[in-house]
């Protein structure tokens, strides 16, 4: 690796630095796999587009990602494959706007309930929802939410020159559900229904240490104390909230949100440039 532009300290306190650009960066190197807390750009040359996406997804982080391309199909493939919370196509990747581009990451760029700041679900995470008792009503709520929201890519901004889709995706690994005798049949049945409806991957267990495969999150429905801190050390969030009666509230917890902002103009011309399509979620 070498510096194309080397950072320089601009003040005595060390709080202001000139941006830096690194070239010759290799895949899986420190510069590739770590987050720079400073204005440093590390450039990796990929032999082809498919490899570039693979390398982009190899980091443990997934807050924002961007692409600049005039190839519509290339943009669509990137949108479908990239593992990050906020995607930007043919525009800058900073300056997320509340409601238009709700903000929040994937993987180690997220912890906790995972509802995006500035999105429809954020306030819901600050409330306590009653535990499910009426399974039939909860299932109806799940089905309605999935048909109208969960399976769709929705653009609430209504702009012509920029599309701002909000959609749900599957977690990259299963969600482990820890149960015991205190877990109700209604809770377990609703989880099974959500998994069947949305395609969410779920593993049930009575002992977390018995799970050998990798997992993305833990839903703790047992009466024992949840291992919040030990799991957090591994980058895993433990959700110990009861299964909610509101089917729409509960279903959203089993998927991960994604915001996709796409420029639909070329230098101000709405008839120019690619018009890639962003699709919703299928099982």
Name what the model sees in each region:
Residues 1-2:
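Long, low-complexity segments enriched in small/aliphatic residues
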Residues 5-6:
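PAS and PAS-like sensory modules
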Residues 9-11, 16-283:
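Conserved C-terminal structural/oligomerization subdomain of aldehyde/semialdehyde dehydrogenase
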